[in-house]
């Protein structure tokens, strides 16, 4: 009887020890691998959910509006950031867009507290010089919006939200109009990225969504010196927010 109890006791201790070792390995050694595995599983669920969703519906509401950039304010922004010199050698709208996007991309991502008070390109840049922690994707998009508009490049700030209403994480990017290609394309100054198909054609948000649904190739390109290491994780992230 004593031998049986002793055996049971040793077995329980061994199981507890193995559990502790397993937890420590997951926590300190294989933490990134486990997190990526869990994210991949969740990411595949996002893709399946997106595949069951409806297509974008055309809006029947006709709203007359005009992208306004007062000449004096636009010149102030161009002079402050020296945009005319930056894009003078650009031979198309897309090249100019990427040159300007690097300004916003130079500010790193964070959700600061306190947040900026004034949301215009110049004040956001001044704020970033005093706060090394940076700001979030929405603020990046607002800054890029004003920078592009000041040189006459039409663009929109687009909020991309998940279907899960309890998920408070969304992503905000810019949709830029390229007159040479007669289309809108996505630019993400927060993650320093834009998307193309296998032939290098620039993609809009709607085209990205369609390609994820159809499981077709999307390439996530970096427009800065930083490389995009886990494109598959970025793919899953977009599946969640489209």
Where do the protein language model's features map onto the residues?
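N-terminal Sec-pathway targeting helices
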Residues: 1-24
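Membrane-interface motif at the C-terminal end of an N-terminal transmembrane signal
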Residues: 18-39
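Secondary-structure boundary elements
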Residues: 40, 44-135
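Extracytoplasmic/secreted proteins, especially bacterial periplasmic and envelope-associated proteins
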Residues: 92-103, 139, 143, 150, ...
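Short His-Asn-centered micro-motif
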Residues: 133-137, 158-161
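Hydrophobic/aromatic-rich core segments of domains that either
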Residues: 142-216
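Alpha-helical and coiled-coil interaction segments, frequently adjacent to or embedded
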Residues: 205-242
């Amino acid at each position: 009887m004593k031998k049986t109890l002793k055996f049971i006791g040793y077995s329980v201790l061994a199981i507890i020890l193995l559990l502790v070792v397993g937890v420590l390995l997951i926590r300190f050694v294989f933490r990134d691998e486990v997190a990526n595995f869990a994210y991949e599983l969740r990411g595949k669920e996002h893709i399946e959910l997106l595949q069951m969703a409806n297509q974008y519906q055309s809006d029947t509401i006709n709203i007359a509006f005009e992208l306004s950039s007062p000449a004096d304010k636009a010149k102030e922004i161009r002079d402050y950031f020296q945009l005319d010199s930056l894009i003078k050698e650009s031979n198309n709208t897309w090249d100019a867009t990427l040159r300007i996007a690097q300004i916003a991309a130079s500010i790193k991502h964070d959700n600061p507290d306190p947040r900026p008070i004034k949301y215009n390109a110049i004040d956001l840049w001044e704020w970033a010089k005093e706060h090394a922690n940076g700001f979030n994707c929405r603020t990046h998009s607002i800054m890029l919006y004003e920078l592009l508009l000041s040189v006459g490049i039409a663009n929109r700030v687009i909020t991309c939200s998940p279907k899960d209403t309890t998920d408070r994480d969304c992503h905000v990017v810019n949709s830029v109009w390229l007159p040479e290609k007669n289309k809108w394309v996505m630019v993400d100054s927060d993650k320093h990225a834009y998307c193309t198909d296998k032939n290098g054609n620039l993609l809009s948000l709607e085209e990205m969504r369609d390609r994820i649904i159809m499981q077709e190739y999307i390439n996530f390109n970096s427009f800065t010196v930083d490389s995009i290491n886990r494109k598959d994780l970025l793919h899953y992230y977009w599946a969640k927010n489209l």
